[in-house]
Amino acid sequence: LLLHCFGLRVGELLNLRIGDIDFAESTIAIRRRANDKTDPRVYQPLVKTCERKLIADTKLMFEISDYILNDRRKIKNSNKHDFLFITYKAGKTQGQPISFSSYHKVVSVVRQSSSLLGGLTGHKLRHTWNYEFSKAIDKNQDISDEKEQQIRSYLMGWRPGSETSMIYNRRHIFELSKKTALEQQEQLFKGEFDE
């Protein structure tokens, strides 16, 4: 859910701690924690670029709170750290922060649950978030291209002025170019262009 709502990177998701969540303000902080001595994982998840604070809908905050209070806390050893996502499988790692390999297993199970999800990856949800963001911006005529770029870069954790958005925005740009080209051709066949 968080991958889709925020377009998070896997490392950002696995790096989340309960303390990063401010339920009073409805925000989630994405923080850099390189070489975290409190993280027991061999391959520690990292926040690749900029730290940021994301605003969350109250329904999403309720879901996170419900998970923490009614699900996560019941798992043995989960109270020994505050990483949000933990391992449920019984054994020596139960209650520990979820690893990259466990995360990929969870995504694989989700992918196999429906033929519609056959190509699902966490990173595709990041692309989906950017596509949906572009469509939402198109509906809001008050936001300039420059402001759109600034907002997108902040929300995605990119440095100001980053060109990375072009990679994530290809599908939306393709759809806009297709629509524009077809409108232009339609006008041509109607004889609406000036000679």
Model-derived regions: residue spans:
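Conserved tyrosine-mediated DNA breakage-rejoining catalytic core shared by Y-recombinases
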Residues: 16-62
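Short pre-functional
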Residues: 1-11
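Short, cationic motifs built from Arg/Lys/His that form the positively charged side of catalytic pockets
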Residues: 8-10, 50-54, 65, 71-72, ...
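Short, flexible/disordered intra-domain loops and linkers
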Residues: 40-42, 92-99, 138-146
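The alpha-helix within a helix-turn-helix
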Residues: 3, 14, 153
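Short, basic (Lys/Arg/His-rich) helix/loop patches that form interaction surfaces
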Residues: 104-154, 158-162
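Active-site/catalytic core of tyrosine-dependent DNA strand-transfer enzymes
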Residues: 57-118
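Catalytic-site neighborhood detector that most strongly recognizes the C-terminal catalytic loop/helix
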Residues: 156-186
